[in-house]
Design a protein with these regions (language model features):
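Acetyl-CoA-dependent GNAT
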Residues: 8, 21-90, 139
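Short alpha-helical
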Residues: 9-13, 59, 125-126
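Conserved GNAT acetyl-CoA-binding A-motif
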Residues: 108-120
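Alpha-helical elements of Rossmann-like donor-binding domains used by nucleotide-donor carbohydrate transfer enzymes
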Residues: 13-17, 35, 99, 103
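C-terminal "cap" of GNAT-fold acetyltransferases
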Residues: 78-81, 117, 121-128, 132-152
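A short beta-loop-alpha structural element at the N-terminal edge
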Residues: 2-16, 27, 140
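Conserved acetyl-CoA-binding loop-helix of GNAT-fold acetyltransferases
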Residues: 84-87, 93-106, 129-133
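Residues within well-ordered alpha-helical secondary structure of globular protein domains
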Residues: 17-20, 133
Length: 152
């Protein structure tokens, strides 16, 4: 497995990861290549998006880091980072999330972030456990979410 920056050519493989998560009942909606491009590869607030790629070239997971701006949909404080992690259930427990976070943490430090938010569904126990294992701490619980912070 290797990690590298996400590129436009990865959108289809990234959509496949999210759709595998959906098929496993761990995501509320399926997605497509167009949505991936807009939300993860080409957004104006992107700091970094990194993919984990298997030895066969298949995308195993990806992680995005965005800069929180005023009025963002997660109500994260302006200037914070906003992280999102997506790992295929077929690649679970193989160190994919840890490898992705190492790259994301490096990018956050280089960008000068002081805090990163992970807004996780209150019913997403796997996501909450992952972020806790990475060192995030719960700092607020708006309706239906558990928001965890990582302080750099």
């Amino acid at each position: 497995m290797k990690t590298r920056p996400a590129m436009s050519d990865d959108a289809e493989g990234m959509a496949a990861v999210q759709n595998e998560i959906f098929a496993a009942g761990l995501r509320k909606t399926p997605t497509d290549k167009t949505t991936i491009l807009a939300a993860y590869i080409d957004p104006e607030d992107r700091i970094q998006c990194v993919v984990a790629e298997g030895d066969d070239g298949r995308i195993l997971g990806f992680q995005s880091l965005r800069l929180a701006k005023v009025g963002n949909p997660w109500d994260v404080a302006e200037g914070w980072g906003i992280i999102g992690t997506h790992v295929s259930p077929l690649a679970a427990r193989r160190g994919v999330g840890s490898a992705l976070f190492r790259d994301t943490l490096r990018a956050a430090r280089e960008f000068g972030l002081r805090s990163i938010d992970a807004s996780i569904g209150a019913d997403n126990m796997l996501g909450q456990a992952y972020y806790e294992a990475m060192g995030f701490q719960t700092y607020r619980t708006p309706d239906g979410l558990v928001c965890k912070a990582f302080y750099l």
